[in-house]
């Protein structure tokens, strides 16, 4: 069974290993999370574990959600996510902490990437620019966006538009350190999104053989 937790990106720093090598790490406040609902195939049509993270004042929660949290006997949570693959011994009201992960373990981290705003094709899709002088009138334009015969622009054509703010998953990141007292995970490398962005950390699906 896979394991997972919801966390918040706090920022990046660096630590040193036993040989004095610098390791860039992202500090993530992972949990503590609480199980809100355990969904089973017989009743809900599929098996999943609904998990909540970060307390929120009761007056900020509408009545249906308030009743949902009360049934589980937990405080209202700001962020709620479902994990499809989960340990069967977890039940409603149980707490999930960083202790589910170990140092050296590989994880997949999912988050919302930083929004860049409206961007052209050079920045957004890495297009090459045209000549900048010698009479050229083609500098940073996208060029042709389709053929004459189709008389339309095909779906998926790379064009200028809003860049970033996409759901991104980075696979096979190493857990360098686990701090159980402060609920912190130190993950090697960078993870998607800005500081204070919400992340989902799961056990790696495609474990790299050379990692």
Swiss-Prot record:
One of the primary rRNA binding proteins, it binds directly near the 3'-end of the 23S rRNA, where it nucleates assembly of the 50S subunit. The gene is rplC. One of its GO terms (cellular component) is cytosolic large ribosomal subunit. HAMAP family: Ribosomal_uL3_B. It comes from Halothermothrix orenii (strain H 168 / OCM 544 / DSM 9562). Gene3D superfamilies: 3.30.160.810, Translation factors. Keywords: Ribonucleoprotein, Ribosomal protein, RNA-binding, rRNA-binding. It comes from the Bacteria. This is Large ribosomal subunit protein uL3.
């Amino acid at each position: 069974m896979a394991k997972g937790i919801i966390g918040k990106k706090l920022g990046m720093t660096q630590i040193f290993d036993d040989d004095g090598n610098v390791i860039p790490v992202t500090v993530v406040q992972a949990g503590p999370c609480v199980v809100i609902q355990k969904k089973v195939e017989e009743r809900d049509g599929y098996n999943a574990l609904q998990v909540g993270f970060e307390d929120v004042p009761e007056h900020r929660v509408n009545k249906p959600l308030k009743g949902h949290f009360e049934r589980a006997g937990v405080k209202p949570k700001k962020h709620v996510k479902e994990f499809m693959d989960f340990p069967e011994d977890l039940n409603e009201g149980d707490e999930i902490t960083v202790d589910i992960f170990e140092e050296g373990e590989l994880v997949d981290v999912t988050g919302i990437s930083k929004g860049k705003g409206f961007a052209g094709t050079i920045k957004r899709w890495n297009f090459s620019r045209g000549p900048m002088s010698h009479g050229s009138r083609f500098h940073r334009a996208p060029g042709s966006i389709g053929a004459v015969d189709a008389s339309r622009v095909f779906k998926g054509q790379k064009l200028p538009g809003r860049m970033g703010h996409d759901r991104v998953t980075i696979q096979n990141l190493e857990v360098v350190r686990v701090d159980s007292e402060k609920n912190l995970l130190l993950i090697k490398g960078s993870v998607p999104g800005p500081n204070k962005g919400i992340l989902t950390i799961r056990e790696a699906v495609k474990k790299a053989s050379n990692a």
